[in-house]
């Protein structure tokens, strides 16, 4: 894919929780997305997805500094996801997944960036049907290895405090209930 944009509105500066915006002139986003979702050997299921995204300024936006050709801040160039799980239609299921995010520029000058990271997760649950009702009792653990990483950036933060931490290891449980009409 490839998209060229004129007068895109982007973050100019952020200070004290307030962000002002500006027109960036010309920008370009080009890349490739690939994915596979495959069931095999009965109830095993594998998924994988990868995105390469080159998002750049195509005209000057920095005033004193030269930013033409720089990466647009807040956008990762590479993102990946993979999972493998035992996924029967009913009964116990379980799986594992991994997510990757490449470094993310934090300012227009590309002088600050959040480092890349990889995190893993596990999930399990039990699905069952009762008449027209389908229930799924599930749980998952995210950031399984309790990695410290930057979860998001504040683009063009005026005090150079660009980085916001991601949550540590966290857990979730839930119940999904659905009714199928005949």
Regions from the PLM with identified roles:
Residues 1, 17, 27, 39, ...:
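Generic secretory/membrane-interface signal
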Residues 2, 22-107, 176-178:
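Gram-negative outer-membrane beta-barrel transporters
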Residues 2-4, 145:
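Flexible, active-site-proximal loop/turn residues at the rims of small-molecule/cofactor binding pockets
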Residues 7-19, 53, 57-66, 105-112, ...:
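Outer-membrane beta-barrel translocator domains and adjoining extracellular loop/strand segments
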Residues 20-23, 162:
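Generic signature of intrinsically disordered, low-complexity, basic-rich segments
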Residues 71-182:
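Conserved C-terminal beta-signal and adjacent last beta-strands/turns
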């Amino acid at each position: 894919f490839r998209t060229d944009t004129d007068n895109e509105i982007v973050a100019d500066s952020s200070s004290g929780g307030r962000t002002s915006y500006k027109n960036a002139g010309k920008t370009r986003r080009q890349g490739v997305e690939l994915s596979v979702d495959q069931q095999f050997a009965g109830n095993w299921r594998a998924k994988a997805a990868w995105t390469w995204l080159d998002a750049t300024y195509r005209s000057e936006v920095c005033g004193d500094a030269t930013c033409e050709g720089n990466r647009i801040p807040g956008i990762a160039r590479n993102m990946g996801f993979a999972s493998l799980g035992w996924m029967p239609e009913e009964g116990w299921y379980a799986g594992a997944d991994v997510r990757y995010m490449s470094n993310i520029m934090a300012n227009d000058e590309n002088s600050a960036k959040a480092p890349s990271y990889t995190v893993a997760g596990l999930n399990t649950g039990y699905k069952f049907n009762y008449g027209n009702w389908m229930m799924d009792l599930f749980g998952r653990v995210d950031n399984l290895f309790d990695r410290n990483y930057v979860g998001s950036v504040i683009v063009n933060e005026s005090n150079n405090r660009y980085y916001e931490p991601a949550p540590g290891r966290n857990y979730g449980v839930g119940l999904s209930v659905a009714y199928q009409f005949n």
